[in-house]
Every structure is written in structure tokens, then in C-alpha cells.
Amino acid sequence: MEKKIAVIGAGNLGLSLAKGLVESKTYKPNQFNLSRRRIEKLKNMAQDGYNIYNDNVEAIKNANIVVVAVLPQKINDVLDELKESLNEKHLLISLVSGVEISSIKEIIGSNIPIIRAMPNTAISIRES
């Protein structure tokens, strides 16, 4: 089964991650569901073959991996929005600085696996 990655918060860091994984030939653009509040900023990504969404719940529906790359002050709202749709098929990866795994578990109240990672935008050129 082909892996599908949802990137919630496809801004600088989220897009850098997606581009870096595609550049490395590990994934193809169509394996990414990119979500962002201002979806018009993802127009070029759609032209490159990425799936784009302005609905976070829709973005994670067919994903195995959910990467959360939002600003720290937005994480509670985003996790509240996603928690009913997250299940045991998902792996949640948080790129949000200053937010511990225990805090995420407290919000989502689920037993899904959670990983915390801290790449930087150099990941887009596989240097992070």
C-alpha cells in the first residue's frame, strides 16, 4: 500500500518537508495532501501534482501519516479539529516547537503513535 502524507499547515516548514521528500525520490507529489488556511498559496503545488485542501479533516482522510506544522498558538485548535478523525491507522508527526508529546496526547485523547521532530527549512534540499 502506497503511503499518503497529510501536511497540516503547509507553510514554509510543511512545504519544505514535502519538497525535500519528493526531491529525495522517497515520495511522489501525489502522495501528499497539503492543507493550509490560505489555499491560494498552494496553487503552484497543485500544478506540480500535490493534492491541496483547505479542510484539515478532508486532508487526513486517506493519509497514513499526519504531519502537523502549524504555529504553536494554533496547535490546540488544529488538534481539536482533527481528534475525531484520527485513528489507529495514523502516525502523527508534530513539527510544532515547544509542544510536548504528552500535551498532544492530552488533547487528542487517542492511542495513536506520535513523533515529535524539529527539522528546519533546509529539509527542502535534504540538508536538515
Model-derived regions: residue spans:
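NAD(P)+-binding Rossmann beta1-loop-alpha1 motif at the extreme N-terminus of oxidoreductases
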Residues: 1-54, 58-61
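Rossmann-like NAD(P)(H) cofactor-binding subdomain of soluble oxidoreductases
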Residues: 56-61, 65-68, 72-128
